[in-house]
Amino acid sequence: MTDPLIPLAPGSLSGKTALVTGSSRGIGADTARYFAQAGANVVINYRNKAPRAEKLAAQLRESGVEVLVVGADLTDAESVQAMFSEVEQAFGSLDILVLNASGGMESGMGEEYALRLNRDAQLQVLDAALPLLSDGSRVVFVTSHQAHFIRTTPTMPEYVPVALSKRAGEDALRERIPELEARGIGFVVVSGDMIEGTITATLLERANPGAIASRRESAGKLYNVGEFAAEVAHAAVDPIPPANTRLVGDTTSFEGE
């Protein structure tokens, strides 16, 4: 039986390099941890919490892998280019790119921030990564059911701007699939329900007391951070699923796509 805390076989990613955006905490951090446990060299990306990122890096290095920590504002083109220049200098190439970072519920970031981060920045990161990605590499985009199904299934008002912008990002990335396939690069969308223990779930619960319990009752189970991160890690190595989409957990409450 597979250890749920070690979802990928030790050594299965030896010699590979993986970059996870927004990986100093939460789903991104656990995804990076699983890659390191499997032997991959890892790039930890963070926006403004360097000590937290460095602490994680020290933990991952105990697996015997190389870890690069790079701070970058993904909405800033120069910052993104600088990040990939560091990656190229350190590792030469990239085998796995996980587009995990997202946002839009933060206060004081402006009305367009959600779209800038969840759509525009995702494309910006992909474009900057392409010269380092080669035949056999994989790009994974992390989203939520509330965003993936936003066109057909309403969500909480507080989450609508995030959901719409993440769906816009997903659509924009899907338009790149033919180009990626021509280069031999796989693309997978991983969509999950509300994830217990995430900042987003906490903020939604604060705005809608009882929201998590209600959703858990409807779904039967809500994944926690580590469990969902394991699905993201598997999406980076498993065969490409139908429609390039890995749906995690219950989707019976959602209609269409």
What are these regions (language model features)?
Residues 108-126, 130, 136, 140:
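Catalytic Tyr-X3-Lys loop
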Residues 21, 94-102, 118, 141:
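Rossmann-fold scaffold of SDR-type NAD(P)-dependent oxidoreductases
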Residues 63-66, 85-99, 186, 241:
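A glycine-rich helix->loop->beta "capping" turn
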Residues 102-108, 138-182, 194-198:
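Catalytic loop of short-chain dehydrogenase/reductase
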Residues 183-191, 205-257:
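C-terminal helical subdomain
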Residues 17, 24-26:
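Conserved glycine-rich cofactor-binding loop
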Residues 50-51, 71-83, 119:
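The beta1-alpha1 cofactor-binding region of Rossmann-like NAD(H)/NADP(H)-dependent oxidoreductases
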Residues 38-55:
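Conserved glycine-rich Rossmann-like NAD(P)H-binding loop of the short-chain dehydrogenase/reductase
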